[in-house]
Amino acid sequence: GQMPLHMRLPKLKGFKNPFKTEFQVVNLDKLAALYPEGGEVTVADLVAKGAVRKNSLVKVLGQGEISVALQVTVDAVSGSAKEKITAAGGTVTELV
């Protein structure tokens, strides 16, 4: 006879961590384009400008260069991004 459907379908393999934290990433080159004159960067500002979706964690990564002083207040910041922001005269505040 025909092989039953539940035996034809592949088994689920592996492990899914239910406590995994997913970040939406924003790189420095994107911040430089969104804030050409510098200023304060918050999660609400990034949502309003359409860079990230609301109700999720935001992490700033260090791809690209930045030359203006930014006051960044987001959930997480990578080490390279923190170095570049402070080198440009800005400040970093992490919420998590």
From Swiss-Prot:
One GO BP: translation
Keywords from the UniProt entry: Ribonucleoprotein, Ribosomal protein, RNA-binding, rRNA-binding
SUPFAM superfamilies named among the record's database cross-references: Ribosomal proteins L15p and L18e (SSF52080)
InterPro entries linked: Ribosomal_uL15/eL18 (IPR021131), Ribosomal_uL15/eL18_sf (IPR036227), Ribosomal_uL15_bac-type (IPR005749), Ribosomal_uL15_CS (IPR001196)
GO CC, one annotated term: cytosolic large ribosomal subunit
Gene3D superfamilies: 3.100.10.10
Molecular-function annotations in GO: rRNA binding; structural constituent of ribosome
Range of residues in the leader sequence: none
A matching Pfam family: Ribosomal_L27A
Domain of life: Bacteria
Function according to Swiss-Prot or TrEMBL: Binds to the 23S rRNA.
Assembly, per entry: Part of the 50S ribosomal subunit.
Family under the similarity heading: Belongs to the universal ribosomal protein uL15 family.
Name of the protein in question: Large ribosomal subunit protein uL15
Species, as recorded: Streptomyces scabiei
